[in-house]
Amino acid sequence: ELFGEVRRLEMPFTIHAGECGSVQNILDAVQCGASRIGHGIALHGQKEAIAFCRDRQIGIEMCPLSNMQTKAVKDPAEYPIQEFLNANLLVTVNTDNRTVSQTTLEKEFAFIRERYAVTREQEVQMTKNAIEVAFASDAVKERLWKKMYTFEK
């Protein structure tokens, strides 16, 4: 009922889902109207659920260092960032809780670059994804796109 009211007001929202628990939590969150999923780790290996999120252009807010600290993946080698990028999900890199994780976006990007062979092109794509799924006005997004375009040159 509450999510219905939020949708009626056209307020975008994120639901933390899939950090632990099943992929069904993610699917339920999207069905409730979430336009972004915090973490989304449970999508790992779930081709139909990945397609479901991709087709609906759901942002996947990955928090690599936090996910390592909380052991959201049993084996850090299985962290699904490359899987999600290769599936063309709208992956973004996030800090989760900077003060708890003692991290910054710079540290997050350095970690995934070193540990998961994330390329500069993928970093740029994730930054573009962040602009695309941002809960910001069109004017703010336009300013960000211009900065991004300048940065790429």
What are these regions (language model features)?
Residues E1-I15, E19-S35, H44-I58, D75-L90, ...:
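Histidine/acidic residue-rich metal-binding segments in metalloenzymes
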Residues A117-K153:
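Mid-to-C-terminal alpha-helical segments outside catalytic/metal-binding sites
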Residues S22-V23, G45-Q46, Q69-T70, V100-Q102, ...:
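Short secondary-structure capping/turn micro-motifs that flank functional sites
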Residues G33-S35, E61-M68:
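Short, basic, glycine/proline-bearing loop/turn elements
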Residues D75-A130:
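Flexible, acidic glycine-rich loops studded with aromatic residues
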Residues H16, I37, I60, D96, ...:
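Divalent metal-coordination and catalytic microenvironments
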Residues H16-C20, G40-A42, C63-N67, R98-V100:
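Active-site beta-loop-alpha junctions enriched in small/polar residues
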